[in-house]
Curated annotation (Swiss-Prot):
It catalyses: 2 D-alanine + ATP = D-alanyl-D-alanine + ADP + phosphate + H(+). The keyword Ligase applies. This is D-alanine--D-alanine ligase. Residues 124-330 form the ATP-grasp domain. Gene3D superfamilies: 3.40.50.20, ATP-grasp fold, A domain (3.30.1490.20), ATP-grasp fold, B domain (3.30.470.20). GO terms for biological process: cell wall organization; peptidoglycan biosynthetic process; regulation of cell shape. Keywords: ATP-binding, Cell shape, Cell wall biogenesis/degradation, Cytoplasm, Ligase, Magnesium, Manganese, Metal-binding, Nucleotide-binding, Peptidoglycan synthesis. It is found in: Cytoplasm. Its EC number is 6.3.2.4. It comes from the Bacteria. The gene is ddl.
Length: 337
């Protein structure tokens, strides 16, 4: 049986470029455990240039092959691609649109679902439409005096707010604000990351995460895990990825009742199915002291770094990551043929 030529595409050039490379390491190691795949790792930089791990400049062509700048190298046909890219252009749905155009099968959510989840405003509209509770918010489409006034009014009403660039991940362009004097500066910074900004009420709550993925034709939601920050603030980019981070993770959140856990999992599956996600996601919730459950956000290509929750929760649920990848990829290619 011939091997599947699998393109492992990573990087992307966004603020999460280096995190993508860390996740790609995990995918590469997992795929190497199977004899089904011939893997070519290619990094995409912020200028749209492709380069193999061996340092060869190349490009992905409309003929679904990797063509090398060194024309003495034979083009490498691509059967399947894993776009291991956090942020733009992976989780935004942009690169998936290209794969659809050239009819190249790929791992993960499709373009529209990715885009809907990555934009925090669109995502919250979907959550509400599906009847899933989420944090109170307003959204802004330009930085002007009216936006500053609206944000200050929200701060006065809610006491504390988060100002977030609507289309960024890993807490990039995200600011906690308690002082009205800082509103204008924070808004200016947030609009520097995205054309739309969302302002949310600060929720004092536990941060719970659920891995939701497809396995043998079923949508699986794990029991919630938990992020615990030593700083007792929100989970910043540095808290997530800095080597000296004091944040810790519990693969199974402690002191969560079976009833609450099942409700969170039900909401997670409802979001996954309702927003037509595919293959994998990590869905994050807040749980308040009054046991109020609020959907926070959906990650359509969750991190797979040494500290990331998704692979740990999948493994804790009894599923092997390599076997999971094999099932998804083979099932998809079989259906295509």
């Amino acid at each position: 049986m011939s091997k599947i030529n699998l393109l492992l595409l990573c990087g992307g050039g966004s603020a999460e470029h280096d995190i993508s490379l860390m996740s790609a390491n995990y995918f590469e190691t997992s795929l190497a455990k199977s004899e089904q795949f011939s893997v070519l790792r290619v990094e995409l930089d912020k200028f749209g240039q492709y380069r193999t791990a061996a340092g060869d400049d190349c490009e992905l062509t409309n003929s679904r092959e990797i063509r090398f700048r060194d024309e003495s190298k034979t083009p490498w046909p691509v059967d399947y691609v894993i776009p291991c890219i956090h942020g733009y252009p992976g989780e935004t749905g942009d690169i998936q649109s290209y794969f659809n155009l050239i009819q190249l099968p790929y791992f993960g959510c499709e373009s529209e679902a990715s885009s809907n989840c990555f934009n925090k405003i669109t995502a919250k509209m979907w959550f509400s439409a599906l009847g899933i509770p989420n944090t109170p918010y307003i959204f802004l489409n330009q930085f002007d005096d009216a936006a500053i006034e609206q944000t200050q009014a929200a701060l006065a009403q809610w006491g504390s707010i988060f100002v977030k660039a609507a289309s960024q991940g890993s807490s990039v362009g995200c600011y906690k604000v308690d002082d009205s004097a800082k509103v204008a500066g924070v808004l200016k910074d947030a609009f520097g990351y995205a054309p739309y900004v969302i302002v949310e009420k600060t929720i004092k709550a536990r941060e719970l995460e659920v891995a939701v993925y497809e396995y043998n034709g079923e949508v699986v939601a794990t029991v919630p895990g938990e992020i615990i920050c030593d700083t007792n603030t929100f989970y910043t980019f540095d808290e997530k990825y800095a080597k000296n981070s004091k944040a810790r993770t519990d693969v199974v959140a402690q002191h969560v009742s079976a009833e609450i856990s099942e409700q969170i999992r039900a909401y997670a599956i409802k979001a996954f199915k309702g927003m037509k996600l595919r293959h994998l996601s990590r869905i994050d919730f807040f749980l308040t002291a009054d046991n109020e459950i609020l959907l926070n956000e959906i990650n359509t290509f969750p991190g797979s770094t040494p500290i990331s929750m998704f692979p740990k929760m999948l493994q804790n649920h009894g599923h092997d990551f390599t076997e999971y990848l094999s099932l998804v990829i083979n099932g998809q290619l079989t259906a295509k043929s």
